[in-house]
Structure formats: C-alpha cells, structure tokens
Curated annotation (Swiss-Prot):
Cofactor(s) for this UniProt protein: Mg(2+)
EC annotation from Swiss-Prot or TrEMBL: 2.7.7.7
EC supergroup of this enzyme: transferase
Subunit structure: Monomer.
Gene Ontology biological-process entries: DNA-templated DNA replication; error-prone translesion synthesis; SOS response
The keyword Glycosyltransferase is assigned to this record: no
Residues the record marks as active site: E106
Catalysed reactions, semicolon-separated: DNA(n) + a 2'-deoxyribonucleoside 5'-triphosphate = DNA(n+1) + diphosphate
Keyword entries, A-Z: Cytoplasm, DNA damage, DNA repair, DNA replication, DNA-binding, DNA-directed DNA polymerase, Magnesium, Metal-binding, Mutator protein, Nucleotidyltransferase, Transferase
Major location category of this protein: cytoplasm
Domain of life: Bacteria
Protein name per Swiss-Prot or TrEMBL: DNA polymerase IV
C-alpha cells in the first residue's frame, strides 16, 4: 500500500456561510438557502442553527418551515458561490497542483510531494483553514490521512470548523471501530445486507474472507475487503481543465517600494508568455491579473476584464494592487485567466451535503 498525504477540505454549510458573511443580519438565527415553499421549493443547505430544528438539505421548504417556523429562506446566488470557490482553489494551488474538486465546496488535495512546512500535511491543512477564514471569512473542515477514503471521513470527524488527522500507524485501529455504513460506496441496501449478515463494524467485516465477500457482493466484495483494512488506492484525479496560468516569485529580500516591484515585471512576463506558448489551442488567454503578497503575508489580487497582456497593462494592475497595501513586498505573481474553448461548464451540486 503506497503512503500518500491526502487532505480533504469541506466547507461548512457553504452556501449558507456565504449568505451569512454577506448579510450579517442572518448570522446567529435559523436560515437556509433554497426555494420558497409556495413554489414547491427545496432546501439546498442550511446553517447549524436550522439543523438544530431538524432542517436538512433536500428537504421540502414547506416541511422545513413546519419544523422551524422562524426559518428564513433566501434565494441562492450561484455566482457568489462560484466566486468563493474559485478563491478557495486559488489558495489550494499555492500548496499543490494535485486537486480533485468534488463540488464547489469540497475537494481532495494530494500534498505528498509538497515542500510547504517541510512536507507536513497537517500544517498545510492548518494553514489552508487559517487562510480561508482570514481571506473569505468562512470556515472549512479538514481531514488528513494516507488515502481519500480516510481523509473524507476525517474531515467530518470534527465538523464544523475542525481538523482531524489519521496517521498511517493509526489506520488499523481507527478503521476497526468504524460502522460499515461509513464506508465509501456503502448505501442503504448494502448496509442492510451487511447487518443481516451480522456485520456492523469494520472489525467484524475483517473476519470475512475475501472470496466470501465476493460471493455475497460481487466485485464490490473486493472493495469491502480493502476498505475494512483502510486500503484505498484511488489517486487524486487532477482537474484537467485549467482556469488560469501564472508565474510568481518569492524574493530573498522584500521589495521596498512600487518602483522596485515594477522592475521585476519584464522577467515575470517573459516566463508567463513562455508558459502560455506551451498551452494547447483549446485555451484562450482572457483577463490578466497580478498577485502581491506583502511582507506581513497579507495579499491581494488585481485583475481587469478587457485589459491587454502587454507590459503597460500589467504595470497599471500592479500599481493598483500595490496601492492596496503600500508595504514592502515579498512575493509577486502575474497571470492570465483562461477561456475554455471546448465549452466545458462547471456543475453545481445543489443537493449535495453542503
């Protein structure tokens, strides 16, 4: 079994969190995102105050209001959720390019080869949580484990706003006490069949030989045998369609002022243009952007639709970005958003566990 470092990030009640962030009046009271009851609406997600009344995702809005008469239901704002998701993925890409999005609010990261924090996946997860809270003003839960199956379980272990780590030496004991219903791919039908066979935990499942499980469950029996032992060889499937291309550099000595930053632009743009030239023809460069990280680790990104990709356009963007902080700079980045000419579109998982 290969040893990898996998992080599963799951935003806490994502749609609701964005609404409460943008409208503080909603915070601290039961609220949900979804359709109105008079229109046969359905709850997309709700905050934890509403969950205390039994309100859940995919519940009819009318039923939710019966459970919680004071529930405030707001219309979804999908573009706001997409924008927040893009910002979160920008943070992810600082640590690894191996990112598998599951929905707007959930993703796997493979940080096995990351050099951040001397390769500590736990510290990377902590830093991601800190940066999301600081920059987006919402919380995420994180799970760290040697594989995807365990990382996803771990992220749910201390929700909301939690971090749980399963180290390789803890896998066998941790998995043994797991209910079989928590296993990846085990739905109600399979869970009921396992219960009829007297199998309620992974410890009990381990008593069954591999061939016996295959006889009972077909090819999924092989999967059950492995999961009961904490084995999951699925790789993080990187998102093959890029949203941007960029280059950045962290300087040994902080750049003290705007002019010293502007002097670095030609070299950065030369590297960026080399990367763009290597891309296939299914992408078209779109909006240019610059990224500035100041000496105190605060950062800002400036982009402009319709601007050119020439040196003067980037000089203007950098000048505007620098003005937001006006402090010595430790990192500069330049890039361009990409338009996917294949027409790929992002799917919203409205009724997922969000």
């Amino acid at each position: 079994m290969s040893l990898r470092k996998i992080i599963h990030i799951d935003c806490d009640c994502f749609y609701a969190a964005i609404e409460m962030r943008d409208d503080p009046r909603l915070a601290g009271r039961p609220m949900a995102v979804g359709g109105q009851p008079g229109q046969r609406g359905v709850i997309a997600t709700c905050n934890y105050e509403a969950r205390a009344y039994g309100v859940r995702s995919a519940m009819a809005s009318g039923h939710a209001l019966k459970l919680c008469p004071d529930l405030e239901i707001v219309k979804p704002r999908f573009e706001a959720y997409r924008e927040a998701s893009r910002d979160i993925h920008t943070i992810f890409r600082d640590y690894t390019d191996l990112i598998e999005p599951l929905s707007l609010d959930e993703a796997y990261l493979d940080v096995t080869d990351s050099q951040w924090f001397a390769g500590s996946a736990t510290r990377i997860a902590e830093d991601i949580r800190r940066r999301v809270a600081q920059q987006l003003h919402i919380t995420v839960s994180a799970g760290v484990a040697p594989n995807k199956f365990l990382a996803k379980i771990a992220s749910d272990w201390r929700k909301p706003n939690g971090l749980f780590v399963i180290t390789p030496d803890q896998v066998e004991e941790f998995v043994a006490q797991l209910p079989v219903a928590r296993l990846h791919g085990v739905g109600k039908v399979t869970a009921d069949k396992l219960a009829r066979l007297g199998i309620d935990t992974c410890h009990a499942l381990r008593d069954w030989p591999r061939l016996a499980l295959v006889r009972e469950f077909g090819s999924f029996g092989e999967r059950l045998w492995g999961l009961a032992r904490g084995i999951d060889e699925r790789a993080v499937q990187n998102d093959s369609r890029r949203q941007s291309v960029s280059v950045e550099n962290t300087y040994d000595h902080d750049l003290p002022d705007l002019n010293s930053c502007l002097e670095k632009l030609p070299e950065l743009l030369s590297s960026l243009n080399e990367r763009i030239a290597r891309m296939d023809s299914s992408y078209r460069p779109d909006k240019p952007f610059v990224k500035v990280k100041f000496h105190d680790f605060s950062q800002t990104t400036m982009e402009q639709a319709g601007a050119g990709r020439d040196l003067e356009s980037y000089r203007q963007l950098l000048s505007q970005a620098f003005a937001r902080g006006g402090k010595p700079v430790r990192l500069l980045g330049v890039g361009v958003r990409l338009r996917d000419l294949r027409g790929a579109h992002e799917q919203l998982e409205l009724f997922g566990d969000i």
